[in-house]
Amino acid sequence: MLPSIAKHAASHQIHPLKKHGQNFIFDGSLCDKIVRASGLEENSNVLEIGPGTGGLTRSILHKNPKLLTVIETDERCIPLLNEIKQYHPNLNIIKQDALKLKLSDLNTNKITIISNLPYHIGTELVIRWLKESSLVASMTLMLQKEVVERICAKPSTKAYGRLSVICSLIATVEKCFDVAPTAFYPPPKVYSAIVKLTPLENIPNSDLISKVELITKMAFAGRRKMIKSSLKNLAPNISELLAKLNISDNCRAENLTPNDYLSLASLI
């Protein structure tokens, strides 16, 4: 039988390292709650980034996935994960930088992603995975609460921005629950939250999404400017294009809906 998560980490003398952005979870009940929020079914193909001391890994394995692939860059954690593998042969351990991973490299059908993501690469990974959404069944992720609020934000709110637009065009998003700093060791300075993203059946093509990325980058860079000013370098006839879409050129970036940005992208 495996020791508790904390004792297992201690037996390998694993302490959190700032360079890896590590904040460990030793509370098995919290890990179970995250997996329940994912709606994980048996015989799924699962991906976890940064398993660390294996708390979330254990909870995922208790749901009997077909295969759980974990990506870990910290070589100190590999022996600990190999000990978990002795009890769960469906655990596949890859020592690699998560930013170098392409989902297509995993050679599996629809992947369920469940991860406590390092804060410093979380947003970048979400965007990358959304661009490979045809390979994703769902993503249940722990991120900074502020990032989750941006993902879930609606138009005309303070948190609404590029991330909100892109996420809502590719997936349904659901904030599951908040996680206090005290749930981690060491406690981070901010709250975290769990968010679930499920790719839509009909997703705009990659060219359109790239255009939306460009348009929103320009629009939200001048967040308080009127949209006609923010996008004046996008197209010389921007006011005409906005009028064609019944969008007032006196609107600001935060007033346009994701579909407004998509429609504008289709005209550029």
From Swiss-Prot:
Pfam families: RrnaAD (PF00398). It is found in: Cytoplasm. Keywords: Cytoplasm, Methyltransferase, RNA-binding, rRNA processing, S-adenosyl-L-methionine, Transferase. GO terms for molecular function: 16S rRNA (adenine(1518)-N(6)/adenine(1519)-N(6))-dimethyltransferase activity; RNA binding. Its EC number is 2.1.1.182. It is an enzyme of class 2 (transferase). It catalyses: adenosine(1518)/adenosine(1519) in 16S rRNA + 4 S-adenosyl-L-methionine = N(6)-dimethyladenosine(1518)/N(6)-dimethyladenosine(1519) in 16S rRNA + 4 S-adenosyl-L-homocysteine + 4 H(+). Signal peptide: none annotated. GO terms for cellular component: cytoplasm. SUPFAM superfamilies: S-adenosyl-L-methionine-dependent methyltransferases (SSF53335). CDD domains: AdoMet_MTases. S-adenosyl-L-methionine binds at N23, I25, G50, E72, D97, N116. Belongs to the class I-like SAM-binding methyltransferase superfamily. rRNA adenine N(6)-methyltransferase family. RsmA subfamily. NCBIfam families: ksgA (TIGR00755). Specifically dimethylates two adjacent adenosines (A1518 and A1519) in the loop of a conserved hairpin near the 3'-end of 16S rRNA in the 30S particle. May play a critical role in biogenesis of 30S subunits. This is Ribosomal RNA small subunit methyltransferase A. The gene is rsmA.
